[in-house]
Amino acid sequence: LATSFKKDEKVYAITAPFLIDATHPLYNVNDVLNGIYIHGNVIGDVMFFGAGAGKLPTASAVVADVVDCVKHKGRNVMTLWSYEKLELGSAMEVERTFFVRIKDRAALEKAKEAFHAVQTVTVDGLDDEFGLVTANMTEQAFAQAAAQFDVAGRIRFDKTTI
């Protein structure tokens, strides 16, 4: 998932694996389909959805855009762009909730404390591994906590921004 937002005159952007709630419109985007979910200050929430991944769908979309440009040649839409350079904020400053897998069952209590865990996930038969859902924390705080453990994987999720 690629996501971005503007806060305090900085723009934050990241492309990474995310968990998406089943009630979110992007949840059903899969296979060769792409989706764009936008929240605008005037328009509110809108979503664009369609073929776009793979050789033929991508080519079809490009041809359709070119045909549309030719059909509307000479018609311009005035847009108000600013040449002011925006400052890119560090993704390490952004707060998120994470699901993290750790390959050291003996470190469970230490990991719960380090990640301020709100939920522990264990699976019967996987005696050497566990998962945690963290409290809301910055990417930087997550990286510092993760450096202490044998992390098998992480996935971000944040219902407030996606």
Predicted segment positions?
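NAD(P)-dependent dehydrogenase/reductase Rossmann-like domain
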Residues: 1-162
